[in-house]
Amino acid sequence: DYTTSTPEICYDDPARLDFNFLAGSPPFSIDYSINAINQTPLTLNGSGNQQYTITPAPTVGLNSYDVIKVTDGNGCESVPNPSNASILVNPTPEVNITVSGVNPICEGQNSELFFPVLSGTPPFNVNYLAGGSALSTNIDGTGNQTTGGPMIISPTTTTTYTLTSLTDSKGCTNTLSN
């Protein structure tokens, strides 16, 4: 048997191929391809359930893994059924933070924060700092809050807004350093 325990992952998460060797003698050599490009054969030394973590991680999008043949330690060949597994890799979510209204503002005025979406699957949970205070909001695919419209801000002192992390609806997270 041949499957994957990770049919949908986030970019840079481990992708795994699962094999269940019911017959034959280890070690098992597996000739396979990724998206129709032949790869260096894998060697798995055990029998029964075996797992292989794909390195490097697959690219963003749908990746097809086809087993061409399995050769056991005695030279006996077979092709598993099914012989194909697919892994969907979701992109790392990315947004910017911009002031879309008046900047700078005077005391008593307000402005708008907007979060232009660059990649990922909406809605998003955005964590940010406002003058050192940790806050969060949910945004849609257009960069507005899911409650509608941009975020209205009216700080009473000069305030710096900094994105710290972003998580999309697929659970993919981007921890930001700036």
For the regions a protein language model found, what residue spans apply to each?
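Proline-enriched interdomain boundary motifs that mark the N-terminal boundary
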Residues: 1-5, 91-101
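Short, solvent-exposed loop/linker segments at the N-terminal edge
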Residues: 6-13, 103-109
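Short glycine/proline-centered coil/turn motifs in the loop regions
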Residues: 22-26, 118-121
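Short beta-strand elements bearing conserved aromatic residues within extracellular beta-rich modules
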Residues: 28-32, 124-128
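Solvent-exposed segments in extracellular or luminal domains encompassing
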Residues: 43-65, 138-162
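Beta-strand-rich extracellular modules
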Residues: 68-73, 164-169
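Terminal edge beta-strands and adjacent linker/stalk segments
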Residues: 75-92, 171-178
